[in-house]
From Swiss-Prot:
Its main location: secreted. One of its GO terms (molecular function) is ATP hydrolysis activity. Keywords: ATP-binding, Cleavage on pair of basic residues, Glycoprotein, Hormone, Nucleotide-binding, Secreted, Signal. Residues 27-189 form a propeptide. Salusin may be a endocrine and/or paracrine factor able to increase intracellular calcium concentrations and induce cell mitogenesis. Salusin may also be a potent hypotensive peptide. This is Prosalusin. Belongs to the ClpA/ClpB family. Torsin subfamily. Glycans are attached at residue 149. ATP binds at residues 93-100. It comes from Bos taurus. The gene is TOR2A. Residues 1-26 form the signal peptide. Transmembrane segments: none annotated. It comes from the Eukaryota. It is found in: Secreted.
Amino acid sequence: MAAATRSCRPWGSLLGLIWLVSAAAASWDLSSLRCNFGSFCECDFQPDFQGLECDLAQHLAGQHLARSLVVKALKAFLQDPAPTKPLVLSLHGWTGTGKSYVSSLLAHYLFRDGLRSPHVHHFSPVIHFPHPSHLERYKKDLKSWVQGNLTVCSRSLFLFDEMDKLAPGLIEVLRPFLGSSWVVYGTNYRKAIFIFIRWLLALGHHGRASPGRSGALPATPAAPRAALCAQRAGPSGPGAQG
């Protein structure tokens, strides 16, 4: 499969700390990136690492380490044709540090339709789980939604915004999907990607806070951008047409 190519443009610097859990890498094979779970899978999963690296080089000014971690984790995960667990990314930092920007970029360069893809699922506690008294219903609905969409397409992305506002019981529903196992609730979930966004504090594995992991990444010299962007032209970014 030939990866789709998009152009990039500078959007400014961003991001606090990135915590990553990924599967080990195997031999690089673009054909393995296609969604192949079930005979009726219609995933629009079309990773464009050149575009992602180009945009991250523009966006993460002074955050070379963060950029490298994101790309390294994604490549390692996607190179493995049979990962033992999903990829879990936790983005956290102060308001305005660009956590949502990074998640939008990932969706944009992994799926043909970006955040509009039917296989990218964006949850906000304020919008989707506003009433604490409805927790049990939310737990049932969330489990059913994740399970059902992974059955349709194992290459799905689940984005959870404002994790600091999410009821703890909902995290418990997600916990079985985040670990190492072959099947959960009869569903193959090991090729999924989960992104958790939290204000300031780090989100530990399975929703537990990780002490001593807050604060901005140390600034490092920005890598030359010309090499990444030399072959690219025109507007791009999440929401761009193309």
